[in-house]
Structure formats: structure tokens, C-alpha cells
Amino acid sequence: MTRIDLNSDLGESFGRYTIGNDDQVLDLITAANVACGFHAGDPDVMAQTVALAETKGVAIGAHPGFPDLGGFGRRKLDMTPAEVKNMVTYQVSALMGFTKDHRLHHVKPHGALYNAAAKDLALARAICEGVAQVDDQLPLYGLAGSQLLEAAKEVGLPAYSEVFADRGYQADGSLVPRSQPNAVLTDPLAVAERALSMVQTQSVTAVTGETVPLKVDTICVHGDNQAALALVDQLRQTFTANGITIQAC
């Protein structure tokens, strides 16, 4: 039986600013990547999001990012490996403190940190070492085929291969930058059919037409996407209709 995890980046509101449809999205996903206050979120939002996820039985993961609130963590900052390691440990520990049993299901880096670590092994290793300082058995979610997954293997962390239902792919398996056309997909039916194909064929078609092989353990739909709720709902319907069980990794 085929099983797939559906995850979403949540807890990204802060102060008086509300981002996303967290309450509704949590009814449809199996794992939540919760912002840890650096790129988005704040202590109150972190506490509220964790409590809500626990109530709904959704697996909770830390979503650390660069300290870039103004840029939503989508700008790469020049930091040493030691700084990245400590930054990740800090954020993961902070979110863990809000959980009932002080345990997390996984860690998934955010935005520019995630994308840079997909290609930069030294940066990826620093992230994994930061996670391991908190819990050396805490699983990592990383882009399929990326250096982040390779670093997790080197450091000894469990890892799951992630794909994106609502993002365009380049021929090398990286995501199309948000500044370019076809970077973000919003049509629920098209996204669901594409995701189903990814699961069934373990591959994706790049925006330039190439077939890119990838391993699919978990699928991300972005919570800050205006179509997020409709996308996740359609994904569930499509997977269920095709005999795919939706379950956290």
C-alpha cells in the first residue's frame, strides 16, 4: 500500500499580521512545519500553532530559517557554518519547548536556508549538526536529491525526501526561483494530478520538459499560498480516490 505524508509551512503570522489559513489547513495535512520566530512567527504564534496541531493530531516539525523577518526568510544571508549550526539549534529548541512532551516529529529548513542547503554541502552539514545537538534521532525533511539529504546521512540523522506539489522544477531537480514564471502553481486539479504522477512515477516534469527522477516521502503545499486550502483538499481527494493512504512519515 502506498503511503504519503502531506506537510505545510505554518505558524508564520506574527504580531498583528496574520498569514495563511492555519486552522483550516491543519484539518487536511499530516505534518506541520512551524516557524520558529526568525523568518516568521513569534512566541505567542508558536505556542498557539503547536497547541492547535496537537489538538488536531498533526505531527509537529520545526521550520528554522535565516533571521530575516523583513524578507520572510527568502534572502540568503552570509553566515558561517558555526553560526548556522547554533541558529538552527536555537530555533529547534525553542519550538520543542512548546510541545507537550518536549519532542518534535521532524525539522525542515525554510526558504533561502532550505534552497541554499540543497546545493551547499557545508551549509547542509551545519544545519544537520544543529539539529543533532538537540536530538540526534530527529528526522530531517529535505529536497529530493539534495545535499541536505546527503548531509543528514553523513551526520546520522533520519531523513525524508520532500517534493513540492505547488512549485515548478528545474532540470537539475531544484525549484524554480519565485521571481521567475511558473514558479508557483495554483490550480488545484492540475496540482493534484501532478502530485499523483510524482508519487506513481517517482519523477516530475521540469518546466523545460525534462523528466527528473525523485524519491517521494512527503509532499509540501505552502500555507502562505492563497490557494493552499483548495490545493490540500484536492490532493486528499485525488490520493484517496487512487488508493493512496495519507499518513505522517
From Swiss-Prot:
Give coiled-coil spans as residue ranges. Answer: none
Provide the family line.
Belongs to the LamB/PxpA family.
Q: Give the enzyme class.
A: hydrolase
**GO biological process per UniProt:** carbohydrate metabolic process
**What is the annotated quaternary arrangement, including any partners?**
Forms a complex composed of PxpA, PxpB and PxpC.
Q: Is Kinase a UniProt keyword of this protein?
A: no
Q: Which reaction does it catalyse?
A: 5-oxo-L-proline + ATP + 2 H2O = L-glutamate + ADP + phosphate + H(+)
Q: Which Pfam families match?
A: LamB_YcsF
Q: Which GO terms describe its molecular function?
A: 5-oxoprolinase (ATP-hydrolyzing) activity; ATP binding
Identify the taxonomic lineage of the organism of origin. Bacteria, Bacillati, Bacillota, Bacilli, Lactobacillales
InterPro entries per UniProt: Glyco_hydro/deAcase_b/a-brl, LamB/YcsF/PxpA-like
Kindly provide the name given to this protein in its UniProt entry. Answer: 5-oxoprolinase subunit A
Biological role stated in the UniProt entry: Catalyzes the cleavage of 5-oxoproline to form L-glutamate coupled to the hydrolysis of ATP to ADP and inorganic phosphate.
User: Which residues form each disulfide bond in the chain?
Assistant: none
